């Protein structure tokens, strides 16, 4: 009997083991099915296949088994699955480590996770999980040491149930949408070493009870959270702390001196808050400190002398504060300092001349202070210096010779000082330099004959004393976008070679002693947006072919001796908003119609032999001109008429033939149920249905037979018969995007020549039409603010909730469309890189954005990122406030951002109220001033010159949707 019992027990154990093995295999296969969404590739987890082998699942990629073939670790990383995590995860009840990260998984977490009682590591970071985080799933996870939910879409309050995890060492809920306060109970994690709650929407005060976390080494609470109050002084008692970050968190008050007790701290990041007072000298007790960032606050006073004890410092960021006094001499003695950025303060006196002598400097920026004396000579002793920026100070003397051979340099900016002497010639041959700004100084001498640099995108030498000829070797600067040589003493002719530069967008050589004619090659530089040759001694005529400059916005050749007739082809240059031909020797009659309707008489003043059609002095000239050409016209008309008749016959034949062919060739690809056919869409491509034209193509309104209205965008230069540059795959990705503030892509119709995108129809047109047309007066401030919030939410979705993120590349008021309820929808996202016209130059097709909206760094990097979109959105906010277009209304070469900065300088007593009152849209009869000021300040944050200093779109949404209480009051009339 005893033997039978043992036998049955052994049989039962064997059955249980076999069942568990089969159960693990079955669970993995079901997990694969649920995690693979419709967008997943067929080869995702391709080795996860059914097998009769008891241990087959142990060889699956990312699977680790114990000696009993039970799954104890599952790691599915960076597999684009796009599905969800199913309840079968709970059947893998021997799991000790679960890592499912960067897989684009969506939905809520299954409660069956609570069955994983052996789990030590739970990592679900970098996915799209949503809903409240189910804290009760952790009740049975008594062994859990690491919980990482970073970068998901969780919302609601932070879960308090997890405080029962007494072995927890690592906790990250960063990068989500958690709201409410930080629970006091989080101080009960006795073994917690890392706590990351940054990048959420948390409010309230930072609990001082967090000081009870005596094992804590890293604490990150900032970015997008908006706490009330300041930094709890009690945090200074966490002696184990090595990394403390509470940036961009709405902190107020002063920096607690008690933080100086954190002797093991190596990184302190408190930037982008509202901290005031002085920098506590007690911080010098943090002898391990390597990185100190207190930038973008309201700190005052001087840099404490006691900081000389911080020998391990590698980074000092104090920029955008109100610090004063001198930059202490000991800064130059810090042996490990790599980054010194103290721009936009009130520092004065002379810089320590030993700065950089430690041989470690990489980033150096002291812009916008009151510094004097000479620039330190050894800044590039390290041979690693990347940024050398000293603009807007009172430096004198030459640029140190050590800058010339500094091959690591990427940015040289010394404008607006009193520097003089010749420029070290090596500067113009640096291989990595992207920007050289020497303007508004007293530099002299000639430019070197040989200039090179594949990375140089911005060369600005304006308002100096340079002489000699402009080197033809500038043709070697293949990345050059901006060339500013105005207000110097250059002579000779304009080198024709310059206009062979493939991405040159702006050239200003006004105010020199240049002679000769305008090079004919200028008409071949199709990327040009602004040309200024004014105030020279140029002769000859404006070259033919100007209409080739399709994106030219500014053309100024005033105050020269240019002669001949004004080219009639200018009438077709629809992008040209500023034309100045004044004070030359032009003759004949000013053309009319077309783009000439945009210009006023000042554009042509000072040309004695030039007349306007409406002037009586032109009557006889017009009569003689018409009579002398009458016979010639008769012959031409006859030839044209005969040719036209022939062309009509041929065209009608071809149209019939093509129509029969096209009816078979069009294909409709729908991203949702559409109750119309491709042929119905094509039938709407008529002149009378056009509702918009732009760089992206022509937009038609299409009314389908079932009563549906759609917007049909006919893209330029794209068809399925050509190399589609990933077009189909990308468009299908865009078609899956769903957000109430994103204009929905319904589908597309295509043949071998053309792609037609089908969008929701927006009956109220674009924001640009309402702001800059006759309708502008009907947009109240409340409506403008609402549109700003909705457009920001749409962009935020593209940047933060799409994987991979989508960069719009062409944010502007004309790409923000309004539905019947005036709700804003972001349009044309992700299309800019596909607008390739095979008939245009590559430089043309690569331009990202619209003139006036393009971020300044694009000029020298030729790259866009999400911060480029943020800059463009900031311009849109300024449009909403000011009611004016971003360019064309502020004078030659001045955009809306430059105009605001100029206006601020001209104010007698500058203040936010005075500046906003000076620039606000006069059509707004009444508005809450504090609300306008609030949005204005957000806009100015977005258009900061340096991309990293701009907020993210998440931060913009948070700021716009959480204004101070006072912004809803104070309605005034001005």
Curated annotation (Swiss-Prot):
Function: LRR receptor kinase involved in the regulation of root growth and root nodule organogenesis. Involved in long distance nodulation signaling events. Involved in the autoregulation of nodulation (AON), a long distance systemic signaling from root to shoot and back again, which allows legumes to limit the number of root nodules formed based on available nitrogen and previous rhizobial colonization. Acts from shoot to root to control AON. Interacts with CLE12 and CLE13 signaling to control nodule numbers.
InterPro entries from the UniProt entry: Kinase-like_dom_sf, Leu-rich_rpt, Leu-rich_rpt_typical-subtyp, LRR_dom_sf, LRR_N_plant-typ, Plant_LRR-RLKs, Prot_kinase_dom, Ser/Thr_kinase_AS
Signal peptide: 1-20
Reactions mediated catalytically: L-seryl-[protein] + ATP = O-phospho-L-seryl-[protein] + ADP + H(+); L-threonyl-[protein] + ATP = O-phospho-L-threonyl-[protein] + ADP + H(+)
Name this polypeptide is given: Leucine-rich repeat receptor-like kinase protein SUNN
Lineage: Eukaryota, Viridiplantae, Streptophyta, Embryophyta, Tracheophyta
One of the record's GO cellular component terms: plasma membrane
Catalytic residues, chain numbering: 810
Tissue-level expression: Expressed in roots and shoots. Expressed in the vasculature of leaves, petioles, stems and roots.
LRR repeats: 92-116, 117-141, 143-165, 166-188, 189-213, 238-262, 263-286, 288-309, 310-334, 335-358, 360-382, 383-406, 407-430, 431-454, 456-477, 478-501, 503-525, 527-549, 550-573, 574-598
UniProt key word Nucleus: no
Glycosylated residue positions: 75, 104, 123, 136, 250, 274, 312, 346, 508, 513, 556, 585
